[in-house]
Amino acid sequence: MIASVRGTLIAVAADHVVIETGGIGWMIYAPRQVLAAPGDIGAEMRLFTCLIVREDALTLYGFKTVEQRQLFETLLSVTGVGPQAALNLLSSGTTDELRLAIATGDVARLARTPRIGKKLAERLVLELKGKLDIKGLPVAPGVSPAVAAVNAELSEMLVSLGFSSAEASTAIAALPPDAPLDLEERLRLALRYFGAR
């Protein structure tokens, strides 16, 4: 595997950059975060890469951080998610926002991404739930990382009780802002939400 490429940036296109190193120009497909601020042509650039080997092509994907590359590889482990869909997901926000959306079952946010419909968004949540570390993630204003972690567990519990990820997300969003951090109490409040419908 080619873990990283460092060299001179010689071209930037809509979906890739070209980095020259050792006389070879490497075409590297990248998410929006890389393409939005690649640096000046002729400047040195380093990307952490993932090489995808297919029958008809060898394709390099590049990322600003190792964490971003690891999340890309994790996304590829989900049935139905190819490299382009994974890039689109990474381009839809920061890695922290994406991990939090998956961990909390935010199917609506994931489904807004190009090439990711509602079914694939639900599959992402189902297959990656519990596999992503969300401890210490910066979250939306007014939501502490502790609340986000408890909500992620609550979402898993609701799904295991037979509710869809979307229903779980809606119930969690309806919890009062002053709801206690106790998981059992939050579960009781979420179930009360379903009973009031």
From Swiss-Prot:
This is Holliday junction branch migration complex subunit RuvA. The keyword DNA repair applies. Coiled coil: none annotated. Residues 1-64 are annotated as: Domain I. Residues 146-153 are annotated as: Flexible linker. Transmembrane segments: none annotated. Has three domains with a flexible linker between the domains II and III and assumes an 'L' shape. Domain III is highly mobile and contacts RuvB. GO terms for molecular function: ATP binding; four-way junction DNA binding; four-way junction helicase activity. Homotetramer. Forms an RuvA(8)-RuvB(12)-Holliday junction (HJ) complex. HJ DNA is sandwiched between 2 RuvA tetramers; dsDNA enters through RuvA and exits via RuvB. An RuvB hexamer assembles on each DNA strand where it exits the tetramer. Each RuvB hexamer is contacted by two RuvA subunits (via domain III) on 2 adjacent RuvB subunits; this complex drives branch migration. In the full resolvosome a probable DNA-RuvA(4)-RuvB(12)-RuvC(2) complex forms which resolves the HJ. Residues 65-145 are annotated as: Domain II. GO terms for cellular component: cytoplasm; Holliday junction helicase complex; Holliday junction resolvase complex. SMART domains: HhH1. The keyword Cytoplasm applies. It holds the Pfam family RuvA_N. It comes from Roseiflexus castenholzii (strain DSM 13941 / HLO8). It is found in: Cytoplasm. GO terms for biological process: DNA recombination; DNA repair.
